[in-house]
Amino acid sequence: GYDFDHTSISTQDFMDRVNTYWIQEYNIDGIRFDFTKGFTNNSNSGWDIQRQVLLKRMADTIWSVNPDLFVILEHWGDNNEEKLLSDYGMMLWGNTTYNYRQAAMGYTNTSNFSNAVYKNRGWNAPHLISYIESHDEERLMYDVNTFGNNSQPNLYNVRDIDVGLQRAELVSAFNFLIPGPKMLYMFSELGYDISINNPCRICNKPALWNYQQVPKRKRLYDITSSLINLRKNHSSTFNTKDFYYSLTSRTKRLILNDSIMNANVIGNFDIWHRNVIPNFAHLGIWYDYFSSDSLIVTDQYMSLTLAPGEYRIYTDLKLNQPSVTLSEIENQDRNEGINFYPNPANDFVLIDFQSLNNIGEANFQITDMLGRVLIQSVINNYEFDRVKKIDVSQFDPGLYQMQISSEGKTFNRSIIIE
């Protein structure tokens, strides 16, 4: 079709007038340009000096009007050219939706989303805008609901809506806490699951505001908000250049080092329990961001066991616990009356089973972070009107996992022994 002569002064003047009008009239703080790889009179090759000169000229004019304005490019050029434009001060979209979707669906062999990290592309500046969803890509939760890993449907079925939304949390924890700007597509924070192709790719989609009243979706909204607030309120940590990542395997981790606060993000993307070594920056007390539980680290290379889809964000500064809607499992535990205390504990833990008196028996066990079973027993029906006392006086200080299973339901809790 027809195209502008990008080298024409008239074309450049027109572009500058339009950009300046939007900046001054509407006080916008950024402009995203579609397919800037086409801003040239040459072919859409991966490396084009004419295009580079034209884009720099346009950006300079924009910054002469507002030096702080975000210039965002949907470019899709060679990495060398994108790096050059990034070094100049422009931000570029980084499409990692395929790998994020594979990770959320539980297909770990294709779940490496390292390309969402600007360092992984050899860039100097954190100007890579990574994202989970966009207007051009399929919805994460549609794929999770439709194609998620269901190879163990009776144990852990990714296609179950509760499991799928938890895995959306897992992916979000990494996406939003990897240093660099992010793009959040509309309703992603509520697990929008209407396909991009329903009824057609560019057809209007329903605005499902009622998702706000669905607790399991409201929880994802709360988690997303809490993640963004965490990085905003602790920008020194989450903008640090001193960070490391391991995103290629079934368990993934992100390590952020900073003089004010260190942080570790760990997650299990498999459909089985897995051990992960967070590689804590130092010994001492670390805190789980969402639960506010403390973890005493006596070995920097200690291993933690994560359930399928589980993630944790540890900081070495105690933060205010965010307000998050309870998950289905947490609500179930609360409704069924399972409670234990004290936590942290020293010599014993008291477990309250009083609301479980309608079942025959339950299997109970406590494991350490290596997965070794330390206590295992069967709790019979007559015990359910009591508070059971568990002796933990012989346990070394650290984090342990308590599991209660009955009639297909499993309740997991973390216990800290001091």
Regions inferred by a protein language model and the residue ranges of each:
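A solvent-exposed, charged loop/short amphipathic helix patch at secondary-structure junctions
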Residues: 142-161, 201-207
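Short, compositionally biased serine/threonine- and acidic-rich segments at solvent-exposed termini, linkers
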Residues: 319-327
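C-terminal outer-membrane/trafficking sorting elements
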Residues: 331-341, 345-418
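Active-site-proximal helices and loops of the catalytic beta/alpha 8
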Residues: 29, 35-137, 173-177, 188-263, ...
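Solvent-exposed strand-loop boundary residues in beta-sheet-rich modules
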Residues: 290-293, 318, 370, 408
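The substrate-binding groove and active-site-proximal loops of carbohydrate-active enzymes
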Residues: 1-12, 36-50, 151-164, 210-214
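An active-site-proximal structural segment forming one wall of the substrate-binding cleft
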Residues: 4-31
